[in-house]
Structure formats: C-alpha cells, structure tokens
Amino acid sequence: RGMWLGLGGLAKGMIGDEVIRLLKQRGIKSCRYRAGGDMVFGDAPPGQVGWRVTVPDLWIAAGEREAKPLTFTAANSAASVSGDVYRFVEIDGVRYAHVVDPRSGLGVTDRRVSCVRGERGIDTDPLATAGLILDETSWQAALARVPGCRGDVAPVRR
C-alpha cells in the first residue's frame, strides 16, 4: 500500500524491448512503444519504410547558418532522448536537470539534449543519459563500444 515505482535509469528502454518482443510474438509486427524519451520500434507501418520521428528540442546543423530539428525514420530498432527540457528544478536562478552528474552529486546544469539510436532500448536509454554528463569525446567513445549505436547531442535552443 502506498508504493511508488519509478521507471528511471534504463528501465523504460528495457521494458520497451520486451513489449515489442511480446507484440511480435503475438503477431503484431508493425508496432511502436514510447515511454518518456524512450522509443522501441517494430516493423514499419504498412506501406512505409519506417516510423518517422522528430526530436523537436534537438537541433542539428543543416548548413552553415541553418539548423533544424533532428528527424529520422526507424524500424526494428530503438531511440532514446534525454535532456532537461521537461524535468528540472530551478534553485537560486540555476537550472538543474533531473539527470545527476555522479562527479558532483548535483543535477546537470549544461543545457543539452541527446538522442541515441541503436538496436535495443536497453542500450540507447543509458547512452542518451550519458550524453548529458560526458564530454563529447568520452560520449562518442562510449557509443563506439556498443555495436550499432550512434548519437547526436546539441545545446537546448529555447
């Protein structure tokens, strides 16, 4: 009675993998799971090459002076987005993300959004979170250690 279960960390990505597996096992091949910033995709919708995904808060360079929201198509894969756009606390004018930097014990203050795409939600979920904490070189090295994963990170443009 009164129990609260938080699905932070890598739970949402891992659960997504299992949901899609179970749906496919029951004959539902074209499916998509989303919980927070975590998405896992089954087969593409009928007549489509994949599920169209736009990450409105992650703007990537599209030219020398232009930027546009990250958009991609996904099927039989996973994607996770992490950032402080919706979950944060402001204390004395400083915005702290819900993601805690283990080096300081405080919420991350560098306003970024990261998106990782890969084969499984259990991989993309924690790597997207790491994109908010690690410097670019360390994050790219972490991505390289997980086959099939790639990511984008950018400052929040709000």
Task: Map each language-model feature to its residues.
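Mature catalytic core of soluble alpha/beta enzymes
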Residues: 1-158
